[in-house]
Amino acid sequence: MDLLLGVLSSGILQNALPFVAGVGRVKRPKRVKLEEAFREAHLCRPVIPYRAPTPYTGGRVKALFVGINYTGTRNKLSGCVNDVRQMLGTLQRIQFPISECCILVDDMRFPNFTALPTRENIIKHMAWLVHDVRPGDVLFFHYSGHGTETKAERDSEELYDQCLVPLDYQVQGAILDDDLFELLVKGLPAGVRMTAVFDCCHSASLLDLPFAFVGNNNFYSGGRHEMRKVRANNFSMGDVVVFSGCDDSGTSADVSNVSSFGSGLVASGGAATQALTWALVNTSQLSYADIFIRTREILRQKGYKQVPQLSSSKPVDLYKPFSLFGPITVNTSLIHYVPQQYLQPWGPPQPYYPPPQPQQPYYPPPQPQQPYYPSSQLPTQYNNLAPTAGIPLMTSSSEVPPGQYPQALSGDQNGGVPPQYPSDQSTYYSSAQYLSGVGKPL
């Protein structure tokens, strides 16, 4: 026993095995004030994280990244900020042409840091992500941090609601999956594509989407698989695909050393993020099934028990090529489950992006993160930050096509155009229509 305690205290075991931390079930949080969130969406200050060689001409490409290590608290994680770093590096490497993004992490030294991932900031920036979206726009959302659950009240299809856990959750509370659906999915118009990645515990149904692949560790063993309907409602005009680190009852591992995933970065990270980014970089023309076969196989080989999940607003044909652009290719055998009004045509085909060429990783390894606040208190530095804290906007340049960004709202003097960064400065390692129907709780 003494020997075992010595090993645990030295941290050797944590470096060898996945570390899973949790916050336990939480008190049911307050509902999000959606109208207020969308009124404040224009206060967000997006940036351009890098320049892709081939710009996307079909619309805007907006992205939101949230990584929370909860540094200095009893629920501290070690790899969530690195997950954001890894995801940004992967998207850059595959030349995903982000036109504007916001980065919420609890490390102010992170390049292009936008704001701390407090409850207020996460909600406001999620509203920014979907505010004023139009057909052809492409959205990407990545969250790495704690996930938890709370007793469901009005949901007849599950006993517990899933929640995201902001930095200040102990004071301000978590964010319900009901509100995540209302914020991110419900009001998307036809022709908008969203891909979301949740690397956290209890994450399979965080957006409460109607279709899911509910699988187990035998998925890679062969046979044909398909999605199934898991909810009677919650349809959307937009096309939404969600990759989750585990099922609703499962935990998502925080890995102390991710070099075994082949990323080259000796640091911490979420197992699901590491496996998914590896699959995206090391395969081309892969299908949804390919991603899951490879991701689950990687995690299984490394000794992880978590099983990544897939959910969507429409039944995905798992054997069609995966893309971050364009409409979901619907499994025709399941299309009758989707109400006709949610199957509007998309219009012209989306442009094809060739597989990326091999590149060297750009983003420097992270520096050791120091606690910014005592474990027993709220983040003290947040109290001194203005609600609009982040990267100030700069005037537009000739490199930003006219009309690519929405018109400035009152008080926004720079046209809502993200700042332009030199190609060697920001590189990375490996709405009124929307509010229609608001006020109808699930």
Swiss-Prot record:
Region ranges (Disordered): 348-442
Reported effect, C201A: Loss of catalytic activity
Keyword flag Disulfide bond: no
Main location: other
Signal peptide: 1-18
Positions of glycan attachment: N69, N112, N234, N257, N282, N331
Top-tier EC class: hydrolase
A Pfam family that the UniProt record links to this protein: Peptidase_C14
Any single Gene Ontology cellular-component annotation: recycling endosome
Molecular function terms, GO-annotated: cysteine-type endopeptidase activity; metal ion binding
Keywords recorded for this protein, A-Z: Calcium, Endosome, Glycoprotein, Hydrolase, Metal-binding, Protease, Signal, Thiol protease
Function summary: Cysteine protease that cleaves specifically after arginine or lysine residues. May play a role in apoptosis.
PANTHER family the UniProt entry points to: METACASPASE-1, METACASPASE-4
Name listed for the protein in its UniProt record: Metacaspase-5
